[in-house]
Amino acid sequence: MALLDLQAMDTPAEDSFGELATGSQVSLLVCEYSSLSVVLCTP
């Protein structure tokens, strides 16, 4: 997680779309594998 956050901080503004895509992937992983998925991923 920390490594992903550092990479996002170093990402130029023009790559913000890629940053959002990475965030979505991380969110999916959290939803699939975390016990907090009920709290974080309710529509």
UniProtKB/Swiss-Prot annotation:
There is a cross-link at S24-C31, S34-C41 (Lanthionine (Ser-Cys)). InterPro entries: RamS. The modification 2,3-didehydroalanine (Ser) is found at S27, S37. Coiled coil: none annotated. The keyword Membrane does not apply. Residues 1-21 form the signal peptide. The keyword Signal applies. Keywords: Signal, Thioether bond. Lanthionine-containing peptide devoid of antibiotic properties, involved in the formation of aerial mycelium. Suggested to self-assemble at air-water interfaces, thus providing a film of surfactant through which nascent aerial hyphae can emerge. The aerial hyphae differentiate further into spores. This is Lanthionine-containing peptide SapB.
